């Protein structure tokens, strides 16, 4: 199969950059509305890790789905490591149930707020980051190759940060819904094509 101009071709299939998007981490926050005795919780929760000299929260890992919950004395909980929003909800429900099982009051299902979705994608093209930095405008770009090999591009719509690498790989961070990554990739492709920096 012959791809249209601008498409990357892998074997017989034409792959659009938006089709390469993979969510690599979802971070969400919640809370149970009251303080948690972290020392007692550490003793009761199997696999919990709490070392207040290193980190002020208790780290509790769930296995299915594989996530890490950071529990704080205030009752706030941050879930990280999930690969989807569904995994965040399932992972936190496991945490809530584990807390209930050791006698900590968790009423109903606390509100869960997605804070950050990190996704990766591939433009299937080698990128000239110097030309991109100039073409996209230095006011939205950070590019210091001696400090970091990627170009940092801050988008206002969607409000995300995109890291572009010379290999054509990119990372989108700061999204609140999965569509933010897709919209960011579409926008990057459109802008780079308009500057003749991507075919």
Where in the sequence are the language-model features?
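Intrinsically disordered, low-complexity polar/charged tails and linkers
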Residues: 1-161, 167-169, 175-199
């Amino acid at each position: 199969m012959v791809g249209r101009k601008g498409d990357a071709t892998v074997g017989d299939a034409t792959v659009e950059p938006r089709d390469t998007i993979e969510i690599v981490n979802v971070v969400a926050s919640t809370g149970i509305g009251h303080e948690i005795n972290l020392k007692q919780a550490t003793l009761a929760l199997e696999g919990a890790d709490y070392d207040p000299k290193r980190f002020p929260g208790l780290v509790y890992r769930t296995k299915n789905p594989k996530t890490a919950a950071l529990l704080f004395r205030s009752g706030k909980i941050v879930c990280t490591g999930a690969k989807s929003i569904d995994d965040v909800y399932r992972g936190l429900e496991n945490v809530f149930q584990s807390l209930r099982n050791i006698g900590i009051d968790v009423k109903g299902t606390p509100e869960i707020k997605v804070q950050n979705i990190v996704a990766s994608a591939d433009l299937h093209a080698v990128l000239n980051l110097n030309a991109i930095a100039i073409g996209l405008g230095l006011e939205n770009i950070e590019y210091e190759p001696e400090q970091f090999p990627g170009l940092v591009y801050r988008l206002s719509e969607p409000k995300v940060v995109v890291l572009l690498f010379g290999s054509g790989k990119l990372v989108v961070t700061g999204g609140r819904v999965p569509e933010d990554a897709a919209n960011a990739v579409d926008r990057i492709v459109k802008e780079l094509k308009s500057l003749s920096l991507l075919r």
